Amino acid sequence: MTIAEIQQEILRMKKEQDICILAHAYQGQEILEVADYTGDSYGLSVQASKRDCSGVIMCGARFMAETCKILSPKKRVWLANPVAGCPMAEQLDLEGLRELKAQYPDYAVVAYINTTSELKTECDVCVTSSSAVEICKKLEQDKILFIPDPNLGHYVAEKLPEKTFAFYKGGCPRHIVVSAKDVEKARAAHPDALFLVHPECRQEVVEQADYVGSTTGIMEFAKKSEHKEFIIGTENSIVEHLQFECPDKKFYPVAVQLTCMNMKVTTLMDIYNCLKGQGGEEIFLPENIMEGAGRCIHRMVELGG
């Protein structure tokens, strides 16, 4: 079958089965075209509970599918590709978190959503890049242990100087490879372009940005801006998506190495096979995880809304 034929079959089957397809913005364009909703982690989290359907296929990382299941416990949830993980989500385990909590006993524990559901059971609240500042500001505690991404944590800390932060030495393996020199080279090659960056990048990179925001924030800024050229400082598929949606504008990656292969493992055939009952992985979580991580995630939705 051609790509178009596979897409048509997916659209037909998901309608027949009352299935909603959610896709993270880092997925390929051909996947976004069959999705009912595309966006960043926060958008996917909210949509998971809002969608009126009997089941959800998540095209993204495992923690996204688990979050979807926790927010929609009565729906069947599948991860389109069972090996789609997130390296950052695996950087800190429960034992490591407990050691950190012992070092910072009077700190509120704020977990980036890119963490395992098990880890979330012992955190006070989780956040996404688009909601982190707002949620941390609303917390009663003045001391915050931010895990696992120190880059996002430092960005939040700069916005909230009235609070004290402690960090874990984690981070996104892709975003942290971007350097100030990469930005300088990109600006030299495209002097008229605005630089839009994700806060998972290092401070030296974020400091040079014309705009700092989540994946969705970057896309919305670029679409609405009257400017015509942009250097994109996040996963390179966003360059592809923006160029597709805004053909009258020009988009350039800040660095060629900003490609997340973990998010690229999901294919149209994965979705097709999942709908056929021949692929994917249905998400099942123990009751203690559903309950414990649920408190953390529901508080995110409450404070972030």
Predicted regions and their residues:
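Active-site loop-to-helix "anion-binding N-cap" substructures in soluble metabolic enzymes
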Residues: 1-232, 238-305
